[in-house]
Design a protein with these regions (language model features):
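Polar/acidic, low-complexity leader/linker segments enriched in S/T/G and N/D
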Residues: 1-37
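Residue-level detection of beta-strand-connecting loop/turn positions
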Residues: 11, 92-94, 180, 212
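A short, compositionally biased
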Residues: 1-5, 81-86, 168-171, 202
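Oligomerization/assembly interface segments of phage tail-like spikes and tubes
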Residues: 38-70, 114-128, 233-235
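Short beta-strand and beta-hairpin "edge-sheet" elements
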Residues: 28, 85-129
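A structural signal for short, hydrophobic beta-strand segments that form beta-sheets
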Residues: 15-26, 101-106, 219-221
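Intrinsically disordered, low-complexity segments enriched in serine, threonine, and glycine
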Residues: 130-257
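Short, acidic/charged, Gly/Pro-enriched secondary-structure junctions
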Residues: 63-105, 236
């Protein structure tokens, strides 16, 4: 039996766990949202101030085509281990990915029904959007700006950056801009050959480091909370204060509704 679907976790296909595994279906649910509202000063009704997307779930259903009870249990355990990765891809979204946790791992509830459908439920909390599998990279040499089209259908997406000091003098301050957001660093020290790197982990925790030292506290009060680029349009990425010998690379993956 061939499957129409395929799911990948950390680029490993589910069907590769065992030849007996058949991917039966993949379902995406409506995202969990919460609306922040304010009461109108007179009369009934509320004004929607903000709609916050909180989570996005994908359910992968599969069958284990073997009547051997022990083998079924062993294969299911291997699928559980497969599901512990952090990046989910599906074959009908070949150019996108989702950062997830396995919220509900599969389990064999019947030893007799060898055609029973099992399911693994994945949930994206930190970034509840599908995002580009291949990032867009924009390079700015020295101080200046560069425009680039950022893919996606969501409002905005996170931007990461790396400032490489290719000169012979220390870079003591730098400002990075993406759209209408900016990170301004002061009283830092990027040595010759060193780099300032800003980025986000799987839990969307921001970091900014020079070598192994955090410089997150060196952002000025004018800095934005996050570096963000609008999706579905051309965006200006800019650098100032880095000097003529700096090379800055901005990295962004467009988000999709």
């Amino acid at each position: 039996m061939r499957t129409r679907y395929e799911a990948f976790v950390d680029d490993v296909p589910l069907s590769s766990v065992d030849p007996a595994v058949i991917v039966a279906d993949i379902a995406e649910t409506e995202p969990d949202t919460r609306r922040q509202t304010a009461q109108y000063p007179t009369g009934d009704g509320q004004r929607v101030l903000r709609t916050m997307r909180q989570a996005l779930r994908v359910t992968v259903e599969f069958e284990i085509h073997t009547q051997d009870v022990r083998r079924r249990a062993d294969i299911c355990e291997r699928v559980v281990r497969w599901a512990q990765g952090r990046v989910l891809k599906v074959n009908y979204r070949p150019e996108q990915r989702l950062r997830v946790i396995c919220e509900t791992p599969p389990s064999v509830t019947s030893s007799l029904s060898w055609t029973q459908r099992l399911r693994a439920v994945f949930c994206a909390y930190a970034i509840p959007y599908w995002e580009d599998a291949q990032a867009t990279r924009v390079t700015v040499n020295g101080n200046g700006s560069q425009d680039a089209y950022v893919r996606g259908t969501a409002a905005r997406a996170l931007v990461e950056a790396s400032v490489e000091n290719r000169g012979n003098t220390v870079i003591k301050a730098v400002t990075l801009k993406a759209g209408d957001t900016a990170f301004a660093f002061a009283n830092i020290s990027i040595p010759a050959g060193g780099s300032l790197v800003t980025g986000y982990d799987d839990e969307r925790v921001l970091s900014a480091r020079i070598g192994g030292t955090s410089v997150l506290a060196r952002r000025t009060t004018e800095s934005s909370d996050d570096l963000l680029a609008p999706c579905g349009q051309r965006v200006t990425f800019a650098v100032s204060g880095a000097g003529a010998n700096a090379k800055t690379t901005f990295t962004v993956r467009g988000w999709y509704l």
